[in-house]
């Protein structure tokens, strides 16, 4: 993945490092300089996961692209189409593909792309929950503003490790703790 200038290995979760994530701070069109196994990427060989893409990511796309870009500019709800910045910066290099019409958290988009491309599970066969409500007590809950994949064993949204603990800790704070 291409990360902001100044990023070091210490900034990347150890779980991703142990999984062998490849990352750089180079621009997308120069990935081949850092990763010799990437030939110079030509037009239309990068898949940009984008809620405004023209078609859905499909199992056959594993053969169509050398790189899949996701989670580059997640953040706003509702989305502000900041992915357009990448499309404008690299015209012709990127092909926009959707993972449905709703914004996902970065980890969910990664998991969804993995299911589709690596496990060959069609998008329509993946079970999701949209805007799940996470309850901490009888009176306290948080609505997550994204789409999540459902864990079929627990029937709950799959969240990043530590997310519930962090949200629970945040729920114990008062407004005074923020200043």
Language-model segments: residues:
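C-terminal accessory extensions appended to soluble enzyme cores
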Residues: 118-179
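Structured adenosyl-cofactor binding patch, chiefly the S-adenosyl-L-methionine
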Residues: 85-134
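Short glycine-rich, acidic/polar surface loops and turns
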Residues: 81-83
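Glutamate identity and glutamate-enriched acidic tracts
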Residues: 9, 15, 34, 54-56, ...
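Helix N-terminus capping/helix-initiation residues
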Residues: 27, 58, 105, 159-161
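S-adenosyl-L-methionine/SAH cofactor-binding core of RNA-modifying enzymes
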Residues: 2-79
């Amino acid at each position: 993945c291409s990360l902001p200038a100044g990023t070091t290995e210490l900034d990347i979760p150890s779980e991703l490092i142990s999984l062998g994530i490849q990352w750089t701070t180079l621009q997308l069109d120069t990935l081949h300089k850092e990763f010799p196994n990437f030939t110079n990427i030509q037009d239309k060989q990068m898949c940009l996961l984008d809620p405004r893409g023209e078609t859905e990511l499909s199992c056959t796309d594993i053969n169509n692209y050398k790189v899949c870009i996701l989670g580059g500019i997640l953040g706003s709800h509702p989305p502000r189409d900041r992915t357009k910045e990448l499309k404008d910066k690299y015209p012709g290099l990127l092909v926009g593909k959707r993972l449905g019409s709703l914004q996902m958290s970065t980890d969910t988009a990664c998991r969804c792309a993995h299911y589709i491309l690596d496990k060959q599970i069609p998008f329509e066969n993946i079970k999701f929950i949209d805007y799940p409500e996470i309850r901490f007590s009888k009176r306290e809950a948080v609505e997550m503003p994204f789409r999540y994949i459902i864990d079929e064993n627990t029937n709950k949204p799959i969240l990043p490790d530590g997310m519930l603990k962090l949200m629970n800790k945040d729920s114990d704070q008062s407004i005074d703790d923020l200043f």
